[in-house]
Amino acid sequence: MRLGNLQLDHPLFLAPMSGITDYPFRQLAREMGCGLVFTEMVSAEGLIRKGEAFLKIKKDEHPVSVQLFGSNPEVIAEAAQMAEAMGADAIDFNMGCPAKQLVEAGAGVDLMRFPEKVKEILTMVRRKVKSPLTIKIRSGWDSKNINAVEISKIAEDCGIDAISIHPRTKDQGFRGRADWKLIGEVKKAVRIPVVGNGDVTQPSLAKEMLEETGCDGVMIGRGALGNPWIFGFKNSGRWEEKPATPPLGEKQRMIHYHFLLVQAHWGEKGAVKTFRKHIYWYTKGLPGCSSFHSKLSGIREKEALFEAIHSYFDFVQKGNQCQSFGSAKNRSVTG
């Protein structure tokens, strides 16, 4: 897949997620086969004020796209130019986030209500940057205002290189099912690449989205949490057939490796604090996970964290289905 002058090896992308897609997570996604990673959402105004203190791109994390959000055309254009100068391989502009604070500020999905402003912003940004420029949108504001096709055509006319669409409305948030049919409608309406997003939780669903909608790529967000195996597309160009749920031993090994990546970036104390949420996602749905998650909340040291992880996986592997993790009957296991 090609974005402007950027050739990508694989059609699976890691979606930008606030508080999640930091450097270690992007690194892991790339190692697992992800074709393009995105930074966490970056405030255009914040980037202009704080520069490198607000955004750092490492030499070994290419290709990477910086996703910006904002509502002021001049500010967004200046921030895009800065991100490009700082090493971004592509710039993405967020018009899909339904978060209350963004919407109230006239940013994110709120912009889809104002097509003329969208045109103004994209035209100005396109004039400022030479790198591939993409946008992230939703279906529209609500069920009575589905305008993804209209916004996509405007973007194409402004010289945007690709469009990512999450086919839910602002009102839906993340409820209900993503309307994949709308991805296909957008694809038919424009000539630039279209990337689908929404409800992809395993490699087979990514393949299904590509085939069903005709889209050029698949952006994966929540489906990658605790599940880096989802980027199951390899250099051979064939989809790798893997079980939907990796073996327990593989999960435990991945947790350890992922933690080391986080520790190398944030330091040991920062890693313990930052990594707990990832452990929740890796172990979600396993027997006794609720009790295990409760125990994690009080852990502050690396040694205690790994002791708890080891004890928990030992508990699960022994098949203690009828006991809760940490109960009296398995206290010898948990220490």
Annotated model-derived regions:
Residues K100-K117, D171-W180, W239-A244:
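Glycine-rich tight-turn/loop motif centered on a GG-T
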Residues L12-P16, V37-T39, V64-L68, I91, ...:
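Hydrophobic faces of well-ordered beta-strands that scaffold small-molecule active sites
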Residues R2, M17-D89:
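Glycine-rich, positively charged N-terminal anion/phosphate-binding segment
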Residues M17-G19, V42-A44, F69-S71, G96-P98, ...:
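Active-site beta-loop-alpha junctions enriched in small/polar residues
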Residues V64-L133, R138-N145, A155-E156:
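Active-site beta->alpha loop and helix N-cap motifs at the rims of alpha/beta catalytic domains
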Residues T39, A90-P98, D157-P167, M219-A224:
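Non-cysteine beta-strand/loop elements that form the S-adenosyl-L-methionine
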